[in-house]
């Protein structure tokens, strides 16, 4: 919810405090519904990689991707993607695999590749627990979660298409990281890494966790307002 002025100030702080030779990469995640030329110009100027949440064609995307008023968001998301493309901004499709699209893996992949022109794709399984008290606990999951067999079938459909024609042309995080591990090259996904905890999750209040999948009281490392991260 922060505006452009906030992010311009962040870029000034990065330039001021970056160590000599240090390389800093900028990424941001958005639903793209409010992106305009000003945002796109800013992202292009600072070489941001923009992750855009989109779950397939309209009939699949809009099952769960609706705004607070209950209106579908698909058309606004696609408009935002086109704005990014018009300004040459690198973008990444962040596609959740859920109960609505789990049986349509190939359709989703072809839509992202052929209609949106996505060259970077992440498939993210929706596995969420009810949180009546604010903290998700227990083993029950919500109705929109992908089923284990559905997730496997989804990835298998996509892989069969990808391995035949898109290796080296379309980056699918799950597949490329798996191939990297096979070749003894460190991958970017924590689930394929030897150890966990290389991607810290910092909450707005200063709470620090070793992974954004475990932002729960049992996994709290500390708070940076009380304890420096180096400790």
Which residue ranges define each predicted feature?
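Flexible mid-to-C-terminal extensions adjoining Fe-S/redox cofactors in radical SAM and related proteins
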Residues: 215-231
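Active-site flanking residues adjacent to catalytic metal/cofactor-binding acidic residues
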Residues: 54, 211-212
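Canonical radical SAM enzyme core domain
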Residues: 1-50, 54-60, 67-79, 83, ...
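Radical SAM enzyme [4Fe-4S]-AdoMet core and its adjacent flexible, acidic
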Residues: 63-75, 82-195, 201, 205, ...
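Short, surface-exposed helix-loop/turn micro-motifs enriched in polar/charged residues
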Residues: 20, 24-27, 171, 198, ...
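Glycine-centered loop/turn positions within well-structured domains
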Residues: 59, 91, 227
């Amino acid at each position: 919810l922060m505006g452009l002025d906030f992010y311009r100030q962040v870029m000034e702080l990065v330039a001021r405090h970056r160590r000599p030779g240090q390389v800093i990469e900028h990424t941001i995640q958005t639903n793209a519904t409010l992106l305009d030329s000003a945002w796109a110009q800013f992202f292009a100027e600072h070489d941001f990689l923009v992750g855009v949440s989109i779950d397939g064609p309209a009939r699949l995307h809009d099952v769960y991707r609706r705004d607070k008023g209950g209106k579908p968001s698909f058309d606004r998301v696609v408009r935002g993607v086109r704005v990014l493309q018009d300004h040459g901004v690198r973008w990444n499709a962040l596609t959740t695999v859920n109960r609505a699209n789990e049986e349509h893996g190939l359709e989703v992949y072809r839509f992202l590749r052929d209609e949106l022109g996505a060259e970077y794709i992440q498939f993210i399984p929706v596995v969420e627990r009810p949180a009546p008290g604010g903290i998700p606990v227990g083993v029950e999951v919500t109705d929109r979660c992908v089923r284990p067999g559905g997730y496997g079938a989804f990835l298998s459909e996509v892989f069969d298409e990808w391995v035949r024609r898109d290796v080296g042309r379309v980056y699918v995080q799950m597949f490329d990281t798996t191939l990297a591990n096979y070749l003894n090259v460190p991958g970017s996904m924590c689930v394929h890494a030897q150890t966990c905890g290389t991607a810290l999750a910092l909450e707005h209040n200063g709470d620090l966790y070793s992974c954004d999948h475990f932002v729960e009281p049992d996994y709290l490392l500390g708070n940076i307002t009380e304890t420096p991260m180096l400790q």
